[in-house]
């Protein structure tokens, strides 16, 4: 060996190895799935590169994975004749984890072994899973197209460092040898290894072969026996594929240890010819909100792998969807740039988007419990849909779930169809309120009249909700109405005011004028309202005015926030309003009005510019 050097692992690798060995040991056989899956990916990459450079096959175009073991040496070897790696690639791929957010991901792991196991599996351990059962791993590899003397040797005990060196390797591809730990003899058993390969690799298009040794005429004859079906799962007839095979294929392409929630396998012929296999995961990826999070489908053209993470086939609000598309209409030399401007891509994207929305609608209809799992994991992402995809807005709206005054629970389980089915006779609008929290929404004074009338209100408390409702203007022909904005339909709901009450209100006109004079430009208007039952005052905004929640969103994003001018509404039947109206002393009157306004602002915004002044004012009035 030449050019030998010992290097230290990236700190995150050391941490991941330690956590992984302890968290995944109960499911240790998955190392074989991960290593065979990597070998399959290496074959896919070679096929793709060989489209433009057939010489990379080096006269050996029969791609396969081989598994062998040596009971005496206690080693298990997985080899492929795929694309292989250069020295730099070995250091990059086997010595570091090139994923943004790795550090924060590792910090999120705790003492819950079952949960950590799911997260680590989701992270994609790949090659490192070998250390679950091995106390030393040796890699010999040579990149396709390189000379034999440009082979690379890599070895590590999975602790703090690894050794890398130059070697001569005649055949292209990668060979990984696991030196098994004491007690891992099951992976030296022919039947056990065969059963694992059958379980995890039937769906892989690449032949997976196991070494077969037979004694003939006093000599040991070595042959290779294919274990898996070696037919791409998505090319098979749906009726021939078991649920277990679909689940294992998902784990192979998504590098996820969890079963998917649901899937859809379709072959389309006619104007466009393609096959799609789309999965909805059961758990959100750990880095879903990371700006660099990779998403998209695996793209095949006429069964030839082209690229991972082809995000052009799925809108951003469906970025959680995993799976693949195999198209007959795209060229084999397609690039990401060509995909961006392709009519074929746009048509496929539209068709696949509709397919996913139909899949989710079916899941919601057939299995409400599973759909609730989906909503808890991906609901916030789906809420981006109404703004992004106007063409499918109604279909997306059907999939949304909300908390509401009907259920009296913070769980988001109410669909818009549920709400519409319960609308009161003569009710024309879908009422909702946005707030910082479920508790704030539920206790808002804006709900008082609607509660009294038995009218349901949707309680929205996710940060994205206010933004979403700017785009989601109606459902089933019924407009949405924020109860914190002034609206004629809300005033109509108020009880009919009798003549004596009208006379009493007329008598309050001078009081309203005094309040207007005192507050001046600080409010847009001052008026009496019959929308309140228990609260003395509220602030609301005009229909065309920026809402409180939208102003908060702007502020959180560091943008300049235009001043929100509120309408100050007073309840003429409330004792505090009557007391203020009866106060002749201007200083005391000012204190009462300011207190009522601060209370209304606090209920609306959750904060005050000067909370200490509010407390002093309230204390003074309490003791006066």
Curated annotation (Swiss-Prot):
Residues 553-624 are annotated as: C. GO terms for cellular component: cytoplasm. Pfam families: HATPase_c_3, HSP90. InterPro entries: HATPase_C_sf (IPR036890), Heat_shock_protein_90_CS (IPR019805), HSP90_C (IPR037196), Hsp90_fam (IPR001404), Hsp90_N (IPR020575), Ribosomal_Su5_D2-typ_SF (IPR020568). It is found in: Cytoplasm. It comes from the Bacteria. Disulfide bonds: none annotated. Residues 1-336 are annotated as: A. The keyword ATP-binding applies. One of its GO terms (molecular function) is unfolded protein binding. Keywords: ATP-binding, Chaperone, Cytoplasm, Nucleotide-binding, Stress response. Residues 337-552 are annotated as: B. Homodimer. Belongs to the heat shock protein 90 family. Molecular chaperone. Has ATPase activity. This is Chaperone protein HtpG. It comes from Escherichia coli O139:H28 (strain E24377A / ETEC).
């Amino acid at each position: 060996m030449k050019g030998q050097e010992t290097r230290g692992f990236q700190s995150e690798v050391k941490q991941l190895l330690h956590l992984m060995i302890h968290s995944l040991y109960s499911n240790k056989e998955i190392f074989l799935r991960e290593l065979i899956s990597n070998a399959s990916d290496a074959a896919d990459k070679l096929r793709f590169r060989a489209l433009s450079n057939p010489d990379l096959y080096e006269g050996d175009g029969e791609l396969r994975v081989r598994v062998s073991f040596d009971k005496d040496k206690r080693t298990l070897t997985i080899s492929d004749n795929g694309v292989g790696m250069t020295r730099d690639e070995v250091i990059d791929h086997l010595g570091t984890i090139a994923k943004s957010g790795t550090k924060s991901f590792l910090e999120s792991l705790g003492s819950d072994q079952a949960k950590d196991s799911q997260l680590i599996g989701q992270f994609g351990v790949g090659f490192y899973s070998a250390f679950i059962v091995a106390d030393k791993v040796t890699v010999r590899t040579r990149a396709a197209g390189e000379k034999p003397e440009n082979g690379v040797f890599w070895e590590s005990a999975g602790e703090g460092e690894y050794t890398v060196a130059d070697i001569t390797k005649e055949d292209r591809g990668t060979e990984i040898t696991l030196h098994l730990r004491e007690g891992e003899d099951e992976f030296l058993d022919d039947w056990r290894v065969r059963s694992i390969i059958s379980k995890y690799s039937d769906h892989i298009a690449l032949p997976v072969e196991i070494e077969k040794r037979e004694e003939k005429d006093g000599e040991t004859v070595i042959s290779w026996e294919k274990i898996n079906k070696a037919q791409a799962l998505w090319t098979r007839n749906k009726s021939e594929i078991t649920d277990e095979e679909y689940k294992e294929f998902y784990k192979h392409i998504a590098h996820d240890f969890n079963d998917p929630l649901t899937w859809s396998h379709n072959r389309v012929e006619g104007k466009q010819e393609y096959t799609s296999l789309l999965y909805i995961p059961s758990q959100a990826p750990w880095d879903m909100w990371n700006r660099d999070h990779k998403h998209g489908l695996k793209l095949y053209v006429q069964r030839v792998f082209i690229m991972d993470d082809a995000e052009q086939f799925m809108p951003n609000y469906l970025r959680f969807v995993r799976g693949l598309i195999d198209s007959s209409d795209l060229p084999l030399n397609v690039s990401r740039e060509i995909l961006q401007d392709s009519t074929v891509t746009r048509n496929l994207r539209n068709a696949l988007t509709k397919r996913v929305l139909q899949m989710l609608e079916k899941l919601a209809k057939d299995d409400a419990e599973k759909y609730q799992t989906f909503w808890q994991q991906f609901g916030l992402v789906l809420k981006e849909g109404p703004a992004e995809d106007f063409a499918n807005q109604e279909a997306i709206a059907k999939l949304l779930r909300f908390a509401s005054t009907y259920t009296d629970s913070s769980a988001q389980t109410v669909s818009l169809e549920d709400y519409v089915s319960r609308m009161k006779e003569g009710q024309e609008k879908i009422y909702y309120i946005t707030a910082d929290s479920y508790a704030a929404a539920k206790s808002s004074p804006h709900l008082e009249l609607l509660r009294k009338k038995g009218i349901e209100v949707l309680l929205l408390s996710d940060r994205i909700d206010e933004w979403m409702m700017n785009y989601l203007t109606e459902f089933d022909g019924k407009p949405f109405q924020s109860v914190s904005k002034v609206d004629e339909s809300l005033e109509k709901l108020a009880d009919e005011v009798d003549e004596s009450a009208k006379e009493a209100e007329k008598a309050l006109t001078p009081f309203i004028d005094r309040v207007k004079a005192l507050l001046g430009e600080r409010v847009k208007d001052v008026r009496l309202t019959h929308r309140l039952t228990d609260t003395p005052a509220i602030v609301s905004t005009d229909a065309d005015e920026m809402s409180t929640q939208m102003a908060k969103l702007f502020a959180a994003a560091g943008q300049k926030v235009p001043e929100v001018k509120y309408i100050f509404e007073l309840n003429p039947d409330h004792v505090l309003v009557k007391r203020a109206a009866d106060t002749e002393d201007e200083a005391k009157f000012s204190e009462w009005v300011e207190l009522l306004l601060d209370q209304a602002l606090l209920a609306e915004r959750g904060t005050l510019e000067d909370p200490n002044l509010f407390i002093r004012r309230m204390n003074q009035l309490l003791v006066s």
